[in-house]
């Protein structure tokens, strides 16, 4: 990738496949920001994935529950934990790699104005057979105790309205510029200059 910061839109990506790609890149020194973590997908039906998460919730230190493992409910933390498991996070190299990673639900500023990319090898439509069942990470998180799905959805609706307004203005401006340049190229002065080789 080799850009200063790569912003990945996680919508409709498979959790594990995206995590492995990101883990490789952050270890190689690439700074990565992941947005819309709540729109990630996990293969398999919702009920099965919920049972798997409840199995994970039962894992705890027998004599002192505060010692871990810690069961994060937010989609951003679930993705972070998946990536952390693919990085040697207890070494200096692994810690430095994880510091190059940021994960968000929704698309907060300033990343709403940055160009976002997708990871083709992790996209659900390219990886899952059509008709196979899948689960949205936001839905799974909400079912196990994440409380902010409505808040993120509301903020995303506002962002989409702002984005549509900006795009409409940009399109109108581009149209004006193209029509003005077309008019200028058809003028008598332009024809005369063209005859002199300009």
UniProtKB/Swiss-Prot annotation:
One of its GO terms (cellular component) is nucleolus. The modification N-acetylserine is found at residue 2. Keywords: Acetylation, Cytoplasm, Isopeptide bond, Phosphoprotein, Ribonucleoprotein, Ribosomal protein, Ubl conjugation. It comes from the Eukaryota. N-terminally acetylated by acetyltransferase NatA. There is a cross-link at residue 176 (Glycyl lysine isopeptide (Lys-Gly) (interchain with G-Cter in ubiquitin)). InterPro entries: Ribosomal_uL13, Ribosomal_uL13_CS, Ribosomal_uL13_euk/arc, Ribosomal_uL13_sf. GO terms for biological process: cytoplasmic translation; maturation of LSU-rRNA; negative regulation of translation. GO terms for molecular function: mRNA binding; RNA binding; structural constituent of ribosome. SUPFAM superfamilies: Ribosomal protein L13. It is found in: Cytoplasm. The modification Phosphoserine is found at residues 43, 181, 185, 187. The keyword NAD does not apply. There are 2 genes for uL13 in yeast. HAMAP family: Ribosomal_uL13 (MF_01366). Component of the ribosome, a large ribonucleoprotein complex responsible for the synthesis of proteins in the cell. The small ribosomal subunit (SSU) binds messenger RNAs (mRNAs) and translates the encoded message by selecting cognate aminoacyl-transfer RNA (tRNA) molecules. The large subunit (LSU) contains the ribosomal catalytic site termed the peptidyl transferase center (PTC), which catalyzes the formation of peptide bonds, thereby polymerizing the amino acids delivered by tRNAs into a polypeptide chain. NCBIfam families: L13_A_E (TIGR01077). Component of the large ribosomal subunit (LSU). Mature yeast ribosomes consist of a small (40S) and a large (60S) subunit. The 40S small subunit contains 1 molecule of ribosomal RNA (18S rRNA) and 33 different proteins (encoded by 57 genes). The large 60S subunit contains 3 rRNA molecules (25S, 5.8S and 5S rRNA) and 46 different proteins (encoded by 81 genes). Belongs to the universal ribosomal protein uL13 family. This is Large ribosomal subunit protein uL13B.
């Amino acid at each position: 990738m080799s850009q200063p910061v790569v912003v990945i839109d996680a919508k409709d990506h498979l959790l594990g496949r995206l995590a492995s790609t990101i883990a490789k890149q952050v270890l190689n020194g690439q700074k990565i920001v992941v947005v819309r973590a709540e729109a990630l997908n996990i293969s398999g039906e919702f009920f099965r994935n919920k049972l798997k998460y409840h199995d994970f919730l039962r894992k705890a230190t027998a004599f002192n529950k505060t010692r871990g493992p810690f069961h994060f409910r937010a989609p951003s933390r679930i993705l972070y934990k998946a990536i952390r498991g693919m990085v040697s996070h207890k070494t200096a190299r692994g810690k430095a790699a994880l510091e190059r990673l940021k994960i968000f639900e929704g698309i907060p500023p300033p990343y709403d104005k940055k160009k976002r990319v997708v990871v083709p090898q992790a996209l659900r439509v390219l990886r899952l057979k059509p008709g196979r069942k899948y689960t949205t990470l936001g839905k799974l998180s909400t079912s196990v105790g994440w409380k902010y799905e409505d808040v993120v959805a509301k903020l995303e609706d506002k962002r989409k309205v702002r984005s549509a307004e900006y795009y409409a203005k940009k399109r109108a401006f581009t149209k004006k510029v193209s029509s003005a340049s077309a008019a200028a190229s058809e003028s008598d002065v332009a024809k005369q200059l063209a005859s002199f080789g300009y």
